[in-house]
């Protein structure tokens, strides 16, 4: 919260019981280590931690009060305490209440791949005209989403909120907090398919929960080239973005410039935009087209939209280019992976004009019964792309090595692969590093930088 709230207001918002009143709270923190004077401390509970153990510390450091699902033995004087059944759920209710104080364009983004990229692109565009709040990094779960909403200030004129999920009901739950005026789905793929009936129809159903909280008069923005999203017939204004002729926001004249990015033309009902996208990958056209669609819908000028797309910057380990001595380049895309995203980035690597192209690939998780086949399919794709070297790491990557041919190595762990990585990362090599987040391939990037 950046607008001061009383303990009684907070208690009413979360449906809690005010055990003891105190001063006004000005901010929310879930980490006792970064408490500022006047904070509301929300002690979260996880498998290996319980924030209730740090309530006294947080209050003594200056927090105005706290939520608590466990009754404290002693109530410190001058501090407010609000009893709730579940602190995480209460945090979500507080965020939903606080969001209601802001009558601004609220963009909610979900999809199987490209959520963070699209969120960053939309924020880059909208920031050319509005003071825009965006989700930091990919804090897109039941804790990150309310924390983002609680960062809203009076000065904000728009917000772009990224929401992820791996089970049914999660997008719906976050949607009750966000209550979007614009709902965006980037695509439907196999990410977390093992938890979603094992089918892409299940993934579509889960992602479509975003529309349940779309506000009256709201806008849906979809990937118009996605076969499953193309089946949706929604009862509100919808803009489809892509290369297909039936798209409302159509991309043409695509010119890929390797790792330096690409250019394209985006045409809407009102205008035509010549765009320069400063990040590699053909998939970037969808984020750019969605930026055009939403920017135009919200009244941005043509110049603001073009400038915003050009201002896009990748975040974290997402298509981050690292230039190393000896004309070596690392394409750091190791934050996460699913079959569609891995295939796209491998095609990008294959099109790179470098003497040597190398891929370091790790397991893709949450694929359920499709896991083995998905890794085998990546191996078959590698045969088409004819890269000079592939290093596969992890249990599931064994299936890739059963179908891939050529200069292909397999290791069970990152540590086992280090010697080969150093040897193969020769001058003039462009290397792609990609795996699911749990593989911790940031270690690979560090090793390659040492080389």
Predicted regions and their residues:
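N-terminal leader/targeting and accessory segments in enzymes
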Residues: 1-93, 350-354, 380-394, 398, ...
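Phosphate-binding loop of NTP-binding sites
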Residues: 12, 90-224, 228-237, 423, ...
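Short gly/ser/thr-rich secondary-structure transition/capping motifs
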Residues: 19-28, 89-92, 140-143, 163-168, ...
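Short amphipathic alpha-helix with an adjacent loop that forms part of the alpha/beta core around
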Residues: 418-424
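Acidic, Mg2+-coordinating active-site environments of NTP-dependent enzymes
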Residues: 72-77, 184-329, 354-355, 380-384, ...
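Active-site beta-alpha connecting loops in nucleotide-dependent enzymes
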Residues: 46-49, 314-317, 334-406, 410, ...
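ATP-dependent carboxylate/acyl-activation modules
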Residues: 109, 316-320, 438-446
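Residue-level signal for inorganic ion chemistry
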Residues: 10, 39, 58, 94, ...
């Amino acid at each position: 919260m950046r607008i001061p709230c009383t303990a009684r207001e907070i208690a009413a918002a979360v449906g809690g019981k005010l055990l003891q009143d105190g001063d006004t709270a000005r901010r929310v923190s879930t980490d006792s280590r970064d408490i500022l004077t006047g904070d509301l401390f929300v002690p979260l509970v996880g498998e290996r931690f319980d924030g209730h153990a740090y309530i006294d510390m947080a209050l003594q450091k200056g927090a105005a009060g706290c939520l608590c699902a466990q009754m404290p033995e002693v109530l410190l004087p001058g501090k407010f305490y609000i009893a709730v059944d579940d602190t995480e759920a209460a945090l979500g209710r507080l965020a939903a209440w606080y969001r209601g104080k802001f009558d601004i364009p609220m963009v909610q983004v979900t999809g199987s791949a490209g959520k963070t990229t699209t969120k960053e692109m939309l924020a880059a565009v909208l920031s050319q005209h509005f003071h825009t709040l965006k989700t930091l990094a990919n804090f897109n779960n039941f804790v990150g989403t309310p924390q983002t909403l609680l960062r809203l200030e009076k000065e904000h004129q728009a917000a772009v909120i990224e929401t992820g999920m791996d089970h049914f009901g999660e997008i719906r739950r976050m949607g009750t907090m966000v209550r979007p005026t614009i709902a965006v789905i980037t695509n439907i793929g196999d990410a977390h398919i093992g938890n979603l009936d094992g089918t892409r129809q299940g993934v579509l159903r889960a992602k479509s929960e975003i529309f349940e909280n779309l506000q009256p008069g709201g806008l849906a923005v979809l990937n118009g080239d996605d076969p499953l999203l193309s089946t949706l017939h929604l009862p509100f204004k919808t803009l489809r973005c892509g290369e297909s002729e039936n798209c409302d926001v159509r991309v043409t004249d695509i010119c890929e410039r390797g790792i330096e990015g690409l250019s394209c033309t985006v045409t809407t009902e009102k205008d035509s935009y010549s765009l320069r996208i400063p990040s590699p990958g053909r998939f970037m056209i969808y984020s750019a087209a969605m930026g055009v669609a939403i920017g135009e819908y919200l009244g941005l000028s043509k110049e603001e939209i073009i400038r915003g797309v050009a201002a896009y910057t990748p975040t974290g380990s997402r298509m981050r280019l690292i230039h190393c001595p000896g004309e070596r380049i690392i394409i750091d895309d190791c934050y996460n992976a699913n079959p569609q995203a891995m295939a796209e980035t491998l095609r990008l690597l294959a099109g790179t004009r470098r003497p040597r192209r190398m891929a370091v690939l790790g397991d893709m998780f949450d694929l359920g019964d499709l896991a083995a086949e998905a890794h085998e399919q990546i191996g078959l794709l590698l045969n088409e792309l004819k890269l000079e070297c592939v290093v596969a790491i992890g249990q599931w990557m064994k299936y890739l090595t059963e179908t891939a041919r050529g200069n292909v190595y397999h290791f069970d762990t990152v540590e086992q692969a280090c010697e080969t990585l150093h040897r193969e990362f020769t001058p003039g090599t462009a290397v792609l590093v990609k795996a699911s987040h749990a593989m911790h391939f940031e270690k690979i990037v560090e090793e390659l930088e040492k080389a």
